[in-house]
């Protein structure tokens, strides 16, 4: 793999490629595992391996390297957010919103701990990447039985306060335990003023396109 990158003049980008593909891998694991935990009467799931396989050839497919050490794009604490005995879950219809919409999430929990969680209080926070809190509150307080698909409540947030493109994060935690999980979503202005400027945009190479290209060549 190193030689292939070097032959294509990308040897210096090895770390960037690993981090990009690794973050995507971790996100896929998160969504796949959460999907199984949200499925009624699902009997469980199995992961073939968590580490890279270096036997007959090389398969760099693990979230850990061949020595069972972290690669740098996800750690044990982050993995346990969506893969542990107690996992808060969210049913979110979509992850991209306009600011004239309302964000909504139905909150559930998958709990296969040693005993039910008596009088468990579930809270939530919505914040941006800088830590600014836009909304927070309590989802509900109830005893959480052993099993999956225990409904806890819902979260709603009017997005009109968001007037610039933002990535926000919903975090849900069950107080008094280490059960916490989070999800990113994106908000964009519903109305955007477009400035034509000097950039010509087209998906067809026609006479008008050639005119703009020739004008650019003349100016250059």
Named regions from a protein language model:
Residues 211-218:
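Conserved small/polar residues in nucleotide/adenosyl-binding loops
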Residues 102-104, 121, 152-154, 180-182:
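Intrinsic-disorder/low-complexity, polar/charged segments enriched in Ser/Thr/Lys/Arg/Asp/Glu/Gln
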Residues 162-191:
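Terminal connector regions
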Residues 185-204:
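Low-complexity, Pro/Ser/Thr- and charge-rich linker/hinge segments at domain boundaries
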Residues 133-163:
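Intrinsically disordered, low-complexity Pro/Gly/Ser/Thr-rich segments with frequent PxxP/GP/PP motifs
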Residues 207-209:
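Acidic, proline/serine/threonine- and glycine-rich low-complexity intrinsically disordered segments
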Residues 1-118:
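Substrate-binding clefts and catalytic carboxylate motifs of secreted carbohydrate-active enzymes
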Residues 102-140, 166-175:
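Beta-strand-rich binding/interaction modules
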